Each structure stands twice: as structure tokens, then as C-alpha cells.
Amino acid sequence: MAVPQNRVTRSRRNMRRSHDALVAGNPNECSNCGELKRPHHVCPSCGHYADREVVAQANEVDLDEDAA
């Protein structure tokens, strides 16, 4: 069976884990709508990237009016 050959000390364990920390995100402000977005990504709220509309936003449909 696979078992550890030697005990891993607290120091060696912590040195191995020293690179596992999470990095906080760095959101930027969208130049079109002002919402926070990820750097180098299309704005999820307005669909703009680099001052052009890349993703057209769908219009919200009121289901009560269309049902009639």
C-alpha cells in the first residue's frame, strides 16, 4: 500500500503551500456604462469592448403584453 516514507514537517508542508494563495480580482470600470468588468473582457452589462458594441443586448419582453 502507498504510505508516506517519512513525516512531512510543518515547515516543509507550509513551504509547499506557499504558492496556493488566491489572488484578488482587479475589476476595471467600463468606459461606456461605468459598471465594473474584468480587464480585457466584454462588459457583461452593456456588451461593449474597447468603445465598440461587441455583443448586442437583448430587449426585455413583458410576457403579459405578448400573451394577449
From Swiss-Prot:
GO terms for biological process: translation. Belongs to the bacterial ribosomal protein bL32 family. GO terms for cellular component: large ribosomal subunit. Keywords: Ribonucleoprotein, Ribosomal protein. Gene3D superfamilies: Single helix bin. This is Large ribosomal subunit protein bL32. It holds the Pfam family Ribosomal_L32p. Residues 1-24 are annotated as: Disordered. Signal peptide: none annotated. GO terms for molecular function: structural constituent of ribosome. InterPro entries: Ribosomal_bL32 (IPR002677), Ribosomal_bL32_bact (IPR044957), Ribosomal_zn-bd (IPR011332). The keyword Repeat does not apply.
